C-alpha cells in the first residue's frame, strides 16, 4: 500500500491529516501490518487533552498491546466510535475508516515538525 502524500507521520507510526485548526490522527498501514489482527482499540474521551509524544490510547492485537503516541498536542474533539465495535477497520482501512481521534491543535507548528510521506517511507523502507 502506498503512503498517502497528503498526510504527515510520526516516528511512532501515527499519521496526521490537517483540517484547518484541527487534525485527524490514526495509525499507518505499516503499523497495522506489524501489529497483526487488531481486536480492541482504547481511545480517550472527547474533551481530553493529549500531549505530543505521550500515550493517548492503545491498540490490542492478537500479538500484543501497543500504546498510541500523540504526534501533536491539543484537545480531543471527536473519537471514532466505530472502532469500539469494529476494531478490524484498523487493518482494513488504516487511512480512511480507521481514523482514531480528531484534535483541536494547541500548537499548529507541531504538524510541520512531523515526517513527510517521503521521509516516512525512507524510515520504514517502503516505496
UniProtKB/Swiss-Prot annotation:
Pfam families: GCV_H (PF01597). Its cofactor is (R)-lipoate. Keywords: Lipoyl. The keyword Transcription does not apply. PROSITE patterns: BIOTINYL_LIPOYL (PS50968), LIPOYL (PS00189). Binds 1 lipoyl cofactor covalently. The modification N6-lipoyllysine is found at residue 63. Signal peptide: none annotated. GO terms for biological process: glycine decarboxylation via glycine cleavage system. One of its GO terms (cellular component) is cytosol. Residues 22-104 form the Lipoyl-binding domain. InterPro entries: 2-oxoA_DH_lipoyl-BS (IPR003016), Biotin_lipoyl (IPR000089), GCV_H (IPR002930), GCV_H/Fam206 (IPR033753), GCV_H_sub (IPR017453), Single_hybrid_motif (IPR011053). The glycine cleavage system is composed of four proteins: P, T, L and H. PANTHER family: GLYCINE CLEAVAGE SYSTEM H PROTEIN, GLYCINE CLEAVAGE SYSTEM H PROTEIN-RELATED. Belongs to the GcvH family. The glycine cleavage system catalyzes the degradation of glycine. The H protein shuttles the methylamine group of glycine from the P protein to the T protein. This is Glycine cleavage system H protein. The gene is gcvH.
Amino acid at each position: 500500500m502506498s503512503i498517502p502524500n497528503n498526510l504527515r507521520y510520526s516516528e511512532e507510526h501515527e499519521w496526521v491529516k490537517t483540517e484547518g485548526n484541527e487534525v485527524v490522527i490514526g495509525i499507518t498501514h505499516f503499523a497495522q501490518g506489524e501489529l497483526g489482527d487488531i481486536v480492541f482499540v482504547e481511545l480517550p474521551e472527547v474533551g481530553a487533552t493529549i500531549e505530543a509524544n505521550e500515550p493517548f490510547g492503545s491498540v490490542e492485537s492478537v500479538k500484543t498491546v501497543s500504546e498510541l503516541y500523540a504526534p501533536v498536542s491539543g484537545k480531543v474533539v471527536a473519537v471514532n466510535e466505530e472502532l469500539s465495535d469494529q476494531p478490524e477497520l484498523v487493518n482494513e482501512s488504516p487511512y480512511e475508516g480507521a481514523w482514531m481521534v480528531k484534535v483541536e491543535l494547541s500548537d499548529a507548528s507541531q504538524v510541520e515538525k512531523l515526517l513527510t510521506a517521503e521521509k516516512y517511507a525512507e524510515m520504514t523502507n517502503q516505496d
